[in-house]
Every structure is written in C-alpha cells, then in structure tokens.
C-alpha cells in the first residue's frame, strides 16, 4: 500500500457513492493529495465522467458495463459550474505533482472499451488529461490538488457518429463561451485566461519543445476513456496524438514506441484549415476567435505538426502539393523519418523533402559541386602547358636533347615517331632493296584493308620498295628531295604540334602506304595472259632481278602479272606514236580501279621498256577486286603512294614550265568536254607540237594514260581488266564520259575534289606558291602557311624575338631551333621575351 494511503486515508468508503464531483470533496488542508477518489485500502474509486457516479476499483467490470449501457446521467456542465475560479499563474507554478484522472482503467480494459457508446458526455478535463498523459504530460492542478477548472474543459458529444467526428461542442467553464473545436478552446484558454498550455514559436523559427512546463508533468496515468472511437477533428491540436487503427491498446503502444521524445506539444495539421472538406466545421465562434486573436491564430498555423499521418490523408493530393513547390531551400536533414519529412508542411521558401535529400546548398550561395579541374601539364624548363601528357613528353625532349627514335638505315634520330616515318620516305627513293622500318620495327605500310590477307599487305609494301629502287636506278633525272626543306617541314610540324593538337592531314597530304590489292584480279590477268612473256632487253630485266632478290618471284601472281605487262607492252609498242589518246571507261565506274598501264610513251615519244614495265607493274598489281561493291572499289582515293614521276624524256628541264602553261590554259578553258578541263588538264597541254592535223586542241596523255592500257573500270562493274585500244582516231578530244578528271596525271591517285588534286600536283612539281613574309618558309598549301604564321606569334600570347634578326616566335623552343640553325655561333640570351 502506498505511503499516501497509509498516512492519509480517503474520506469515501466502499459503500459511499456520491454523485458529486470528486473535486468538491478535497479540502484546503490537503495540498499534497495524490490521485482523486482513491479510498483507503482497495477502496480506490472510478468516477463516471458523465454522471459522476463512483465505483470501487474492484467493481471495474460494473463500471465498464455502466459505460457500455450508455449512461444518461446529468451533464457534466452542471457540475463544472461549482468549481472554484482559476488560480493565478503563481499558484500554477507551485503545483508540481501530476494529477491523475478520475476514470482509471488498465490497458487491458481498453479492449473492452474499444466499442464506444453513443451519447457519452465525459468531462473535457479528463479527455485533456488523458491526452496530455499520452504525451508524457498531465493537466495542471491547483495548490490544493484540484484540477484547474479554467481552461473550459466541458464537452458534449453528439448522440450519433461519435466514431467519425469530434465532440459537438466545447464550453469554457469560466466564461461559458462554447467552441466547436478543442483547438480554439485551448487558444481561448491560453490567450484569454492566461494558461500556458502550448508553446508559441517566433515568426519564421521552427517550434522547439519546451523543457520545463509549469503545473505538473505526469509520466503515468492508468485511466483512459474510450477515445479510440471518438475521432478528434483534424484541426484539433490533439490530432497530433491520433494514431491509425481502431484499438486503443495498439494506439498506446504506438504512442510509446513511435513518438519522438521531445516533439512540439500542439500544432495544427498542415493546410487543413483551408481544406474545403473541413471548412464547414469552423463555426462563427472560431472565425471570431481568429479575428479577435489574429497573432495567436497566425502563430498557431505556423507550428510544425507531429508527423503522424491521419487516416483520411490524401497522399496523391499532398504529393501534388509538394511537387508543385520546388523553389525553396532544402529542409534540414535531421527529420525523424522520411514519412515525417514527406508530411512536413512547407513555408513559402521551403523545398519538398523528397527533392531535398540529400540537402544541397542554395544555388545563389554556392555553385553546384563539380569535378576538380584537370591538372594542366606544364614543362619544367620553359613553363609551357599542354593538355595531354604525350605532348609534354615530346616537348620535353626538345630541352633534353633526347632522340629515342633512330633510323635503322642511317644515323638519323628524332624525337617523334611521326618524324621517323616521314624520314623513312627519303629512303624510298634510294637504292635500298629492303623495306624500310618504322620506329615500331614494322613495315611502313599500313595494315591491309579488311578482307585482304597479311601476305598481301607485306607483299605490297615490299613491292613499293622494289618500284622505288627501280625508279631510282632508271630515272637519273628524278628530282631529289631537298634535305633542308624537309628539315624545315619537320620543325614546322613539331611546332604545330606544340601550338595545338595535331590536326588531321588532308587526304592529299596524308602518307598512306596501305593500298588495296586484289588477288582475284591478279589471278584474272594471270589466267588471261599465260605464256605471253616476252623478253624486252637488259633494262627490263632489272626489275625481275630485284624481284628475285626480294623473293617476289616465288609469288606466282606477282611474277606472272609482271610478265604479262611486258608482253602487252611489246605487242602494242608500235601503236604508241599513232595514238594521242586512248578511249576511257565510263565516268561512273569505280574510282579505285582507275589505273592504267603505261604504254611507254610520254607526249608521243617513246620511253624505255623498263620504265614502262615499272609503271605497268604498279598499275597491274593495283587493280580492283572483281566486285564493284568491294571495299577497294568504294575507296575515293587510291591507296598507293608510288609517286611515279614522268618517265625519262628529252627536255626534262622544260617539263614543269610546260605543265604550268597547260595548267594556266586549263583554268581559262574550263571546257567540260575536255578530259582535263577545269584546272585538271594535262601539264603538257600547251605544247604546240602536240596539235592534231585538223588544228583541234590536243592534250597529251599523262603517264599510264595512253592507248592499250588495261582498264580497271569496266562498264559492267565487274572490275575485271580488259585490254582496250582506242577506237576513235587521233585529234578527237576526250569525251565527257572519259577518265575521271580528279585523277593525278603523274601517279594516278584519285581525289575527291579538284582542290586536293591541285595541292597534290605540287608535290610532283615542287611548286610552293605560299611564302612567309617573315622567314624563308614556303609551302604548297595555304593552310600550312596559316599554321606556320602561328609560330611567329598569336594574339594574347607572349612573343619571343631573335636578338639577331628580330624574327618573332610564339614558342620558345622554336626560337631555340632558329638560333641553332641560323645563329649557332651566338649564345642565346634568356631575356628576350617581349609582350
């Protein structure tokens, strides 16, 4: 038995049933009394909140049955009139003991009370006390232990629909003002009568729970009326205690396990005060209260609610509301749960929680997170920065002098693999019978096209070397490479790589060693010309000797194709001077199969059989595949780089002047019916000695273009080559349907447009019309001059000037090379940088 029951027995006995309120029994000399209506021993009482009947605790079942039978006793409003007036706030602070409600039931009894009856009219203080106890609180009591009667704690319940609606009215016991909502009753009690029931947050600040609340906080309250069936209004502050479910035991368990320890005391549900489904519940009193106390009403609407979801919550509508509000700073990450963040009401500057997780800084205050900037590669010697590490490695070698790429055929060494490949071209015109090697040890020929074998690729590269040797031995008038110019080009290209990313060379400038070679086409010629081998003298045997040295004679299709060329050349040799042109194939035929066999004449003059054999071999082995749809036939540019110059002839020193004259004439004529019109006519077109008998303009045929050549572009598109002798007599200009006009007259390479062909011709003629005004650099293409000019300075970049010749450079390493090349006897001064 408790100390209170032993020392101070209660006034009521087991048999004394009093219809009066329990508060009237307590006297002024008992300020520290504990729970109300607790008789001595087991005579603890249960008081009906409707009729104020007292039941012994042992008769709890009778009490429950009494409640089930819908007690129709007197209204509690009449009893509440007798209560004393409201105490002062000082008396409220003195009270420290929790007050327990008069209706005491155990959690097991909640199941029995789960089906609430209609017409129940409990006193509102019990409801408030019980609900406050769910939150770990209890109603304030006076210094004498009596419940404070001030905050209008009376309520009447409608006789019907109790499980679906709140009490029909709430009446303040002090001023008798009725309210239809408990929330407005609480506002009235706090603002009008001075009670501290809930905390008010300042404008714009989140509500924080109050730690110390006056007038007694209780942690236990065994009594609990059947409130699970009494649905409190959604705009009621007690709505935060509502838990989905129909059983009060489940509700109490959820309340103990799910509620955060320190949430706000009371707060209205979000936006429900404007819900059209609930607006009719707001009576005139409530609207008047909102008008009378606008500040309190506005503050209440800003309170953060407990994030428990009412059963009638419309999730789809709420989500649409949240999705529409996207212009806000993110919420704090310290929310109890995602569901609570989802249901959190947002102020005008807030952001939906599902859009704000994880929280991000506002856009105006900090930029969005980005990846760390890429570290620039800078040279340790001159400070120049590069985008790629590979460019820095190559540039660093210009300072260190390292030259890791060495030529296997000479003492040349360079800093880049591309330079070594370019250098290896110089060996193509020398007398080396071996295939040159690049820096990687492989053949300079690129990989063969898809569909060809490795054998073909290696054979084609070897054949290229053989033809180059054959040309160098039999063409003493071949224009040699200019070593100084080549070195200058190397320097220029290195500077361009340092200035910018390496650009793709145009099709006319790219050195492409790979070329398509069809074994089927070779076999076709092989089968069509067996036994047609004719000896043509010692010079013609020079190439077979080289082929034997290169083990090419063991490859049957190479050997027989070569002998077939010699046989055809011998049979048609006497027709060379009579024919000025040869009939060409259809213009729409495959460009990649457009090579012809040189018939041994140039400008109507005969040439040595060996020279024609070399040209015939190169053309013969490069015939397209039988199918016009093969990858070889689709190539716009023939992939062969034999760079065959015009064969040896009289007046070799006058060749280029004749070509330039013919080129100028072709620019003026632009006759579409001329096979080389529109800047593509023969370089020898202006020679008067080639006029025909009838006075018509005759164009001499470039090497490999005369009659009797084997056409690689048959009209059937089969790709098979057929010996063809021109039908029309001399003097007839080439037809519109003749040979493609974008084919090089020297090497037979086909180009996509005439501008590329024009630039390509300069590689044969040596013409360099574009000259730098600051140095002696000259080139054949305007774009190269443009790139070269960047080496002399760019807008916004530092300029380095030579102290001796005052030549500007945009890259310091270029100045170093200039000094080494032109002023090697001078010492380079470091203070030469100018802005």
From Swiss-Prot:
Q: What residue spans carry the region label DNA-binding?
A: 737-835
Keyword Ribosomal protein (UniProt)? no
Task: Please list the residue ranges that the record marks as compositionally biased, kind Basic residues.
Answer: 1-12, 421-430
The effect annotated for residue 47 to P is: In IDPFH; de novo mutation; loss of function in transactivation of transcription; reduces the interaction between isoform 2 and isoform 3; disrupts the nuclear paraspeckle distribution of isoform 2 and isoform 3; does not affect the interaction of isoform 2 with TBR1
Q: Which residues bind Zn(2+) 1?
A: 48, 51, 66, 71
Residues engaged in binding Zn(2+) 4: 802, 805, 818, 823
Where do Pro residues bias regions lie? 355-372
Which residues are annotated with the PTM Asymmetric dimethylarginine?
271
Residues binding Zn(2+) 3: 772, 775, 788, 792
Tell me the InterPro entries matching this sequence. Answer: Dev/Hematopoietic_TF, Znf-C2H2_CTCF, Znf_C2H2_sf, Znf_C2H2_type
Give a short account of its post-translational modification: Sumoylated with SUMO1.
In the record, Phosphothreonine modifications are located at 701
Impact of altering residue 46 to A? Answer: Abolishes self-association
Q: Where in the cell is it found?
A: Cytoplasm; Nucleus; Chromosome
Which residues does the annotated region (Required for nuclear body formation and for SUMO1 recruitment) include? 1-210
User: Where is the sequence biased in composition, kind Acidic residues?
Assistant: 482-506
Keywords attached to this Swiss-Prot or TrEMBL record, sorted alphabetically, are: Chromosomal rearrangement, Chromosome, Cytoplasm, Disease variant, DNA-binding, Intellectual disability, Isopeptide bond, Metal-binding, Methylation, Nucleus, Phosphoprotein, Repeat, Repressor, Transcription, Transcription regulation, Ubl conjugation, Zinc, Zinc-finger
Effect of changing residue 61 to A: reported as:
Abolishes self-association. Reduces expression in erythroid cells
What residue spans carry the Gly residues bias annotation?
Answer: 706-720
Q: Per its UniProt record, which disorder involves this protein?
A: Chromosomal aberrations involving BCL11A are associated with B-cell malignancies. Translocation t(2;14)(p13;q32.3) causes BCL11A deregulation and overexpression.
Give the protein's biological function. Answer: Transcription factor. Associated with the BAF SWI/SNF chromatin remodeling complex. Binds to the 5'-TGACCA-3' sequence motif in regulatory regions of target genes, including a distal promoter of the HBG1 hemoglobin subunit gamma-1 gene. Involved in regulation of the developmental switch from gamma- to beta-globin, probably via direct repression of HBG1; hence indirectly repressing fetal hemoglobin (HbF) level. Involved in brain development. May play a role in hematopoiesis. Essential factor in lymphopoiesis required for B-cell formation in fetal liver.
Domain comment, as recorded: The N-terminus is involved in protein dimerization and in transactivation of transcription.
Query: What is the name attached to this protein's record?
Result: BCL11 transcription factor A
Q: Which organism is it from?
A: Homo sapiens (Human)
**Organism taxonomic ancestry:** Eukaryota, Metazoa, Chordata, Craniata, Vertebrata
Q: Which gene encodes it?
A: BCL11A
């Amino acid at each position: 038995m408790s100390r209170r029951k032993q020392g101070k027995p209660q006034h009521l006995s087991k048999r004394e049933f009093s219809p009066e309120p329990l508060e009237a029994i307590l006297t002024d000399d008992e300020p520290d009394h504990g729970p109300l209506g607790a008789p001595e021993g087991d005579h603890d009482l249960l008081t009906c909140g409707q009729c104020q009947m007292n039941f012994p605790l042992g008769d709890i079942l009778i009490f429950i049955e009494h409640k089930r039978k819908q007690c129709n006793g007197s209204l509690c409003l009449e009893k509440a009139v007798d209560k004393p007036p409201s105490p002062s706030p000082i008396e409220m602070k003195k009270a420290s003991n929790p007050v327990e409600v008069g209706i005491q039931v155990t959690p097991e009894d909640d199941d029995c009370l789960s089906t609430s009856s209609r017409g129940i009219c409990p006193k509102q203080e019990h409801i408030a006390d019980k609900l406050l106890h769910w939150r770990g609180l209890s109603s304030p009591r006076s210094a004498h232990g009596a419940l404070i009667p001030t905050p209008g704690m009376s309520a009447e319940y409608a006789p019907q629909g109790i499980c679906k609606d709140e009490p029909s009215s709430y009446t303040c016991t002090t001023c008798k003002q009725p309210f239809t909502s408990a929330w407005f009753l609480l506002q009235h009690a706090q603002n009008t009568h001075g009670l501290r029931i809930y905390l008010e947050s300042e404008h714009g600040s989140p509500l924080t729970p109050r730690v110390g609340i006056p007038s007694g906080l209780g942690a236990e309250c065994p009594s609990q009326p059947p409130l699970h069936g009494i649905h409190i209004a959604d705009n009621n502050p007690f709505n935060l205690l509502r838990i989905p479910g129909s059983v009060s035991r489940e509700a109490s368990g959820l309340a103990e396990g799910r509620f955060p320890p320190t949430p706000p005391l009371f707060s209205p549900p979000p936006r429900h005060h404007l819900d059209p489904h609930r607006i009719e519940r707001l009576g005139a009193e409530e609207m008047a209260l909102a008008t009378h106390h606008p500040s309190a009403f506005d503050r209440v609407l800003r309170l953060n609610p407990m994030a428990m979801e009412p059963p009638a919550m419309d999730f789809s509508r709420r989500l649409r509301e949240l999705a529409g509000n996207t212009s806000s700073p993110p919420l704090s990450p310290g929310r109890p749960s995602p569901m609570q963040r989802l249901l959190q009401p947002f102020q005008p500057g807030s952001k939906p929680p599902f859009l704000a997780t994880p929280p991000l800084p506002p856009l105006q205050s900090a930029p969005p997170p980005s990846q760390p900037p890429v570290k620039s590669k800078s040279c340790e010697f001159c400070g120049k920065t590069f985008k790629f590490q590979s460019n820095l490695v190559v540039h660093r070698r210009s300072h260190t002098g390292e030259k890791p790429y060495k030529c296997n055929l000479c003492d040349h060494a360079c800093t880049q693999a591309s330079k070594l490949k370019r250098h290896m071209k110089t060996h193509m015109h020398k007398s080396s019978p071996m295939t040159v090697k690049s820096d990687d040890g492989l053949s300079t020929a690129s990989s063969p096209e898809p569909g060809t074998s490795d054998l073909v690729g290696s054979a084609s590269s070897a054949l290229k070397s053989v033809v180059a040797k054959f040309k160098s031995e039999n063409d003493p008038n071949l224009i040699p490479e200019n070593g100084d110019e080549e070195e200058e080009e190397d320097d220029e290209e290195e500077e361009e790589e340092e200035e910018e990313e390496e650009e793709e060379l145009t099709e006319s400038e790219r050195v492409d060693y790979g070329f398509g070679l069809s074994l089927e086409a070779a076999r076709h010629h092989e089968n069509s010309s067996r036994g047609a081998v004719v000896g043509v003298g010692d010079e013609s045997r020079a190439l077979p000797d080289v082929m034997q040295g290169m083990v090419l004679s063991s490859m049957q299709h190479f050997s027989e194709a070569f002998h077939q060329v010699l046989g055809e050349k011998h049979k048609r040799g006497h027709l060379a001077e009579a024919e000025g042109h040869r009939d060409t194939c259809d213009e729409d035929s495959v460009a990649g199969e457009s090579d012809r066999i040189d018939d041994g004449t140039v400008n109507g003059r005969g040439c040595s059989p060996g020279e024609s054999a070399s040209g015939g071999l190169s053309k013969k082995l490069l015939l397209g595949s039988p199918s016009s749809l093969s990858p070889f036939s689709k190539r716009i540019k023939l992939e062969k780089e034999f760079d065959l110059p015009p064969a040896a002839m009289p007046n070799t020193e006058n060749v280029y002047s004749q070509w330039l004259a013919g080129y100028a004439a072709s620019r003026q004529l632009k006759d579409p019916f001329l096979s080389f019109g529109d800047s593509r006519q023969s370089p020898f077109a202006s020679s008067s000695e080639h006029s025909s008998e009838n006075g018509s303009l005759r164009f001499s045929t470039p090497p490999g273009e005369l009659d009797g050549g084997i056409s690689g572009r048959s009209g059937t598109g089969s790709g098979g080559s057929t010996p063809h002798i021109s039908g029309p007599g001399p003097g007839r200009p080439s037809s519109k349907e003749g040979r493609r006009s974008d084919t090089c007259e020297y090497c037979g390479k086909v180009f996509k447009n005439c501008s590329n062909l024009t630039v390509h011709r300069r590689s044969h003629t040596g013409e360099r019309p574009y000259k730098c005004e600051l140095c002696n650099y000259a080139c054949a293409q305007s774009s190269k001059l443009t790139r070269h000019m960047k080496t002399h300075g760019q807008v916004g970049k530092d300029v380095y000037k030579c102290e001796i010749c005052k030549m500007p450079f945009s890259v310091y390493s270029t100045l170093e090379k200039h000094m080494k090349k032109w002023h090697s006897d001078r010492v380079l001064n470091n203070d030469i940088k100018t802005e």
